[in-house]
């Protein structure tokens, strides 16, 4: 078991490969990446046998930008017999159980990649889950409580209906969602589908127990590039008053709430009203990521806000390098000023050729 499988958005396999290579090296782990273009996943093969498990425990999943899921996997099982796929899978898990206590397992996820071709397997995966779960429980697995120390999820990652990786992830260091995807329902009254990006960002970056404390009716926000109001909608829904900055029109439904002021200005030139404390800045403007990074940094250095969520658009070829440069620029500028901060970034399911960044002064 010297392999990690990392799920990612189709077309971002090279970024995922570069990131896991860098982050593993920081932990003193080296290996090579197997990349298939547009497959929606990569396999990182460690040079030493137990290092994949070490990374699954110790490499902070929340710090991986392009990974939707991270799990330790076996060699690929191929030519699974159609009449009995379960037996070879259980045999593989029995080998894993010699080193890993599978009695600590709490859940089973039977998954495939998030590609148009692989999605055809989803129906099969759903049907296969029930009989496999019953068989694994007979082995004494999948019976631990959700609060089990060192709890595990068991995963099957199908490439075809007769070929899969068998693996596991650690409950404290993974995504609990099937395929690593947090699926959200589009609100019927939202002005645009971009609203789901900010909703997913809030659910991803802000601790559930802190959401109402950090986002409530006593707070003020600025939305740069707000039109028609997809991101403003999420803030107003949580009670915030929003200065919506855009030359374009905002949805009438948002004006009717009485919780927005439309500022028909350039997002790069706008400054918050004097003597008005701004808690949050959000920004989904289509612009070079370096310009957005500079603008966001300016807001923090000027003391105009203390928390922000923004997107960095990535249409260029060297996307991973661009992300690293932008995040390093922000971190360097804030550190030089002596500011303590929390910085997280993620390629969210509802993002496309972009990543979402969460930044908060401490």
From Swiss-Prot:
One cellular component (GO) term of this entry: cytoplasm
GO molecular function, one term: S-adenosylmethionine-dependent methyltransferase activity
Enzyme's top EC category: transferase
Binding site for S-adenosyl-L-methionine: 194, 227-230, 246, 266, 284
The organism's place on the tree of life at top rank: Bacteria
Active site: 313
Main location: cytoplasm
Catalytic activity: cytidine(2498) in 23S rRNA + S-adenosyl-L-methionine = 2'-O-methylcytidine(2498) in 23S rRNA + S-adenosyl-L-homocysteine + H(+)
Subcellular location: Cytoplasm
Keywords: Cytoplasm, Methyltransferase, rRNA processing, S-adenosyl-L-methionine, Transferase
UniProt-listed GO biological process terms: methylation; rRNA processing
HAMAP family (UniProt xref): 23SrRNA_methyltr_M
Subunit structure and binding partners: Monomer.
Protein name as it appears in the record: Ribosomal RNA large subunit methyltransferase M
Native organism: Aggregatibacter aphrophilus (strain NJ8700)
Gene name linked to the record: rlmM
């Amino acid at each position: 078991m010297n392999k990690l499988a990392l799920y990612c958005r189709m077309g971002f396999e090279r970024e995922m490969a570069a990131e896991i290579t860098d982050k593993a090296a920081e932990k003193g782990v080296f290996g090579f990446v197997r990349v298939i273009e547009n497959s929606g996943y990569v396999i990182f093969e460690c040079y030493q046998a137990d290092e994949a498990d070490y990374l699954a425990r110790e490499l902070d999943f929340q710090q991986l930008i392009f990974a939707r899921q991270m799990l330790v996997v076996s060699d690929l099982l191929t030519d699974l017999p159609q009449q009995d796929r379960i037996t070879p899978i259980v045999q593989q898990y029995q080998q894993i159980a010699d080193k890993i206590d599978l009695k600590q397992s709490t859940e089973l996820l039977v998954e495939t990649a998030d590609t148009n071709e692989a999605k055809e397997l989803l129906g099969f995966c759903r049907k296969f889950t029930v009989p496999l779960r019953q068989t694994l429980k007979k082995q004494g697995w999948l019976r631990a409580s959700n609060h089990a120390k060192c709890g595990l999820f068991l995963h099957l990652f199908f490439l075809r209906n007769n070929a899969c990786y068998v693996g596991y992830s650690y409950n404290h260091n993974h995504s609990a969602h099937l395929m690593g995807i947090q699926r959200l329902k589009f609100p019927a009254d939202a002005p645009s589908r971009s609203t789901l990006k900010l909703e997913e960002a809030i659910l991803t970056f802000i601790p559930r127990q802190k959401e109402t404390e950090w986002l409530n009716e006593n707070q003020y926000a600025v939305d740069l590039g707000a039109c028609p109001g997809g991101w403003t909608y999420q803030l107003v829904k949580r009670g915030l008053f929003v200065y919506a900055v855009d030359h374009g029109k905002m949805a009438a439904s948002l004006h009717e709430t009485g919780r927005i002021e439309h500022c028909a200005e350039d997002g790069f030139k706008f400054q918050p009203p004097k003597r008005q404390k701004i808690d949050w800045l959000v920004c989904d403007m289509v612009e070079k990521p370096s310009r957005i990074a500079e603008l966001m940094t300016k807001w923090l250095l000027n003391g105009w806000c203390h928390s922000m969520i923004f997107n960095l658009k990535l249409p260029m070829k060297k996307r991973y390098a661009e992300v690293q440069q932008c995040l390093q620029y922000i971190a360097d500028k804030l550190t030089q000023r002596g500011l303590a901060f929390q910085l997280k970034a993620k390629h969210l399911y509802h993002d496309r050729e972009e990543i979402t960044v969460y930044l908060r002064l401490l």
